[in-house]
């Protein structure tokens, strides 16, 4: 039995310097684990088995480190893994103590944000955007009054324009002229003056009578 175990383990111990596939390594390791009690009885076979296990573990560790380093190199994360060198250590951990700046040297002052008015396309500060939008669109109290006044003025002007146009059209249909209108107006004015003068004369006569 010992000779058979020796024949099985001797090739494994002799070829420790060669490269085995993963399946072969797992098979050899399982064989050593199964025959562990028998290997203890033979010191030579035990040394060969221990050397083989050590070499297999070393190959696995080296291969893992190599694959991880290759991956970091390809992805560009190798510099982050290396860290900062000793010559740049002081500058890397420099703390900024200037006013209005944080420890990293970034400004802490709040920048004023500007908003674009959708009605007039002007840049307005964010704090004044709401009142500006009310005034610009006529939605505030004062703005609504001004807008209603403007609307009433426009309606009045349009009404006067329409009445003037209808008056001109009606005057043209009756066939009257400006001269005839002036004559009628002057005659009416004379009649009013004559009636007023007669009334004044009558009142003066009545005041002069004695009873």
Curated annotation (Swiss-Prot):
Subcellular localization(s) per the UniProt record: Nucleus, Nucleoplasm; Cytoplasm
Pfam families in UniProt: Sgf11
GO cellular component, one term: SAGA complex
Disulfide-bond pairs as recorded: none
Record field: compositional bias (Low complexity): 157-166, 197-211
InterPro entries, alphabetized: SAGA_su_Sgf11 (IPR013246), SGF11 (IPR051078)
Transmembrane helix as UniProt keyword: no
Sections of the chain in a coiled coil: none
Keywords recorded for this protein, A-Z: Activator, Chromatin regulator, Cytoplasm, Metal-binding, mRNA transport, Nucleus, Phosphoprotein, Protein transport, Transcription, Transcription regulation, Translocation, Transport, Zinc, Zinc-finger
Superkingdom to which the source organism belongs: Eukaryota
Functional note: Component of the transcription regulatory histone acetylation (HAT) complex SAGA, a multiprotein complex that activates transcription by remodeling chromatin and mediating histone acetylation and deubiquitination. Within the SAGA complex, participates in a subcomplex that specifically deubiquitinates histone H2B. The SAGA complex is recruited to specific gene promoters by activators, where it is required for transcription. Required for nuclear receptor-mediated transactivation. Binds independently on SAGA to promoters in an RNA-dependent manner.
Protein name: SAGA-associated factor 11 homolog 1
Native source organism of the sequence: Drosophila grimshawi (Hawaiian fruit fly)
